[in-house]
Amino acid sequence: MELIFLGTSAGVPTRTRNVTAILLNLQHPTQSGLWLFDCGEGTQHQLLHTAFNPGKLDKIFISHLHGDHLFGLPGLLCSRSMSGIVQPLTIYGPQGIREFVETALRISGSWTDYPLEIVEIGAGEIFDDGLRKVTAYPLEHPLECYGYRIEEHDKPGALNAQALKAAGVPPGPLFQALKAGKTIMLEDGRQINGADYLAAPVPGKALAIFGDTGPCDAALDLAKGVDVMVHEATLDITMEAKANSRGHSSTRQAATLAREAGVGKLIITHVSSRYDDKGCQHLLRECRSIFPATELANDFTVFNV
């Protein structure tokens, strides 16, 4: 999986940072696709500066209904339709997301020429396609807000083709059945169990993408053991009380959570517009003093999961 940050500013855009949007490139050999997490104003324009086609976008996950995470959605939906894209699209989000989308389209005389499904979610598992699952966790914010945990299912281990050939199993369709863990029967009556010729399963990757939040009970479960955790660092340590009073987190709180959850990497985003480039490096240093494996997301930064 690959993360592409389209917007990394909190609340309002700046000259160098747009408001929140994160693209997830699934990069799966049998199922390509793009997922979008939040869609602040101007997201479709940010997408034009990447190599990705909106036609590949098939799922959008909205954390909450504040404008800096949402106001780009109607324009993206309409432009996708005007471009002749017919691939279905599913939007997941909190209560009210359906009313927002339908109202915006209705009063502007707009529509989509592709199937559009809107799923209003609660806490818990919201999606599983057999390759990966997505679970929503409630966060601490003035509006109903969720973070999303994306977990790939474990992949089957490699098939020991050399051992199978030595056992007299001809390559071809039988290998495919054995790779799926099935038992086959050879012409001489012998039974071959695929599980005996498979290496250990390859653990799937796990990713946690937080919406806006102050410290909360669900945060540790959302982030526990993930390879990559994306979390806001809206304000620095000196402004922690102000951040919390508005349902946001400081650098220290993001980094401490990453350490306690045992994540592989922390990526901080959603930084206040009060910070210029020098100020953002200050935020990064504060996080790294607690959790060294921290990176700062800028617009169009790409990270592998």
From Swiss-Prot:
Binding site for Zn(2+) 1: H64, H66, H141, D212
Residues annotated as catalytic: D68 (proton acceptor)
Cystine connections: none
Cofactor binding, note field: Binds 2 Zn(2+) ions.
Keywords assigned by UniProt, alphabetized: Endonuclease, Exonuclease, Hydrolase, Metal-binding, Nuclease, tRNA processing, Zinc
Cofactor: Zn(2+)
CDD domains (alphabetical): RNaseZ_ZiPD-like_MBL-fold
Protein EC: 3.1.-.-
Subunit structure: Homodimer.
Protein family according to the UniProt entry: Belongs to the RNase Z family. RNase BN subfamily.
Role according to the record: Zinc phosphodiesterase, which has both exoribonuclease and endoribonuclease activities.
Protein name, entry field: Ribonuclease BN
Gene: rbn
